[in-house]
Amino acid sequence: RVRHPVINAWYKSRNYHDDHGEGMDFYKVGTGRGCGGIGVFNAGACFTSGNWVTQNHLASGPVRTVFELTYAPWACGNGVTVSETRRVSLDAGSHLTRFESRFTLAGAASVAGGPGLDISAGHLHNGLLATDPEQGWLANYEPAQTGKGSICTALVLPHGGTLATDAQGCVYLLGTL
């Protein structure tokens, strides 16, 4: 709605789920993977990281904000551990956020993993899911919320993958890590 950056002010005030004339971010992640949280599928189960443990602010300007998040190694079954460093780029005026992840594995040469999109009714993300795993995308259009509007979340990868779903209802687009 506005042509000036609002993210810093929203997060500083801790009030970004309500519209005060500049729009809002009413997407609630809760304990789910949200939009883009990584899942590793190994030993017949999905394994996810905890919250990030370190952050590094790389750039903050009128056009782009960039930061990196580091996640502690997490166990992924059969003696495999994975750690992640994720770079997040937010461009002013864009409806998309860029995530670039680097993974370190121990205990295996590779595992199946990738970003997820929470479509569970338990997290109020019970929308209309569309996918094209061969083209590398999935999207969820959620029903309108009174006083807030609608939200659409999507994942777009530079390559195709295969779909997998975890026990909580999050759908993942998997590749090889």
PLM feature spans:
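A recognition module on extended beta-rich or small alphabeta surfaces enriched in W/G with H and D/E
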Residues: T131-T162
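An acidic-aromatic substrate-binding cleft motif
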Residues: R1
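Beta-strand-rich recognition/accessory modules
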Residues: T153-L177
